Amino acid sequence: MDDLLSRELADLAALHRLAPLMSEYLPNTAHELRPAALAAVVDEVLLGSRTVLVECGCGASSVVLARLLARRGFGHLLSVEHDERTAAFVASQLRREGLGHVARVVHAPLAPHPAALGNAHWYHPQLVHDEVSAFVERYGLVDALLVDGPLLGDARYPALPVLRGVLAPGAAVLVDDAERPDEQTVLVRWAEEFALRFRTTPRTSLATANALD
């Protein structure tokens, strides 16, 4: 079975598993998590009893995760998104579904960042600092970090230098698009700098690791 067919079958199976959380149609935004990757994230939240989630890059997946947390009865999600249109849609959908008590979207435009590689931009430094600090102060250390933005792979590098200090021991770090060269470069650097061991599942395009104590 070739890789493309394997991925497509994995996505079809994931859509079936995700059906209980698909109460209504959600449009795909740019660079949305594939169904197989989203199902893997949902599994991690449930099996790992994750309760304090931060997501870099939001979309339909943010709404699905918020539905999961609301139905489970505990947990909170903070999503950071640079695209104003996407952030506005997700925030509006969360309000419309009454999910504002479990999930919040922050529109953080891209800007120069001291932790960025080369001339890459990341989310606005002060805005991210303020929002994440308030989130952690209210709900505790982050036990699941999902990195699916910004769009360009090496632009994602600052996520761990910036957020490592608010990760709980054993926190899950999940990175989408792990098969792309830029993401692989970032994963290698993170593994070396933060003593992480990433595992990549080709059918999901997701790399996962657990933060050390």
Predicted regions and their residues:
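Flexible, charged surface loops at secondary-structure boundaries
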Residues: E44-S49, R71, V136-L141, V166-L167
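S-adenosyl-L-methionine
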Residues: A91-G140
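A generic local structural motif
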Residues: A39-V41, H129-F135, P158-V162
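C-terminal substrate-binding/active-site "lid" region of AdoMet-derived donor-dependent transferases
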Residues: R138-Y139, D143-A144, P150-D213
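A conditional alpha-helix N-cap/helix-loop micro-motif detector
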Residues: H31-P35, P125-V128, G153-R156
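SAM cofactor-binding core of SAM-dependent methyltransferases
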Residues: H31-P112
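Generic enzyme active-site microenvironment
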Residues: L53, S79, L146, L174-V175
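Rossmann-like AdoMet
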Residues: M1-E32
